[in-house]
Amino acid sequence: KTYDVTTASHPVGESVLARTSMSYLGRFTDPETGTVVKSDFLAQFHCSETFAFPDSVKDHKITKSEIKLYIDKFIGDSLTSFKLSVYPLNKVMDPEVDYYTNIEPSKYYDTNQKPIAVKWFTLSDRTIDDETRWDLDYYNSINISLPVSIGQAIYEGYINNPDAFTNTDKWANSGIPGSKGFYFKLEAGDR
């Protein structure tokens, strides 16, 4: 049987409200239309009122700084390679402002600065064994190593000024590296 189908496109505006705790990262090219949909994101981190560094920090030295971006769902080939660059934000994002999907990231970071981290990754992490991957406690993530100096500066900020860690507003305005957040920019890869 043959069926006639009619479709129509309707504009919804330049952007939509982006107030969410979910972030989207990637690039997808529609094979039918050639339309490219790309998504990067800005992230500002919450500091809980009960935050405390663990007593396990030995000799006041941080040995590793890492951000994990947890993956809930994805489309496309899980073995496609992507390149992600991470830039520190130089401006606090106002929690009272509604941000839209047409936000200009360049207003929040130094475009002349090199990224503080670059990560090539696939959505299916091939660096772990199958036993770990299929464990019920495993959460798929993109693990991004940051300069240890950022972790050390955050730790020293906590030791020297614990009040900066008592709530998100104080943390974001503390001037401590990483406190304003990061821009996660997709540089290469297509679903």
Task: List PLM regions with ranges.
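Secreted, disulfide-rich extracellular signaling modules
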Residues: K1-R191
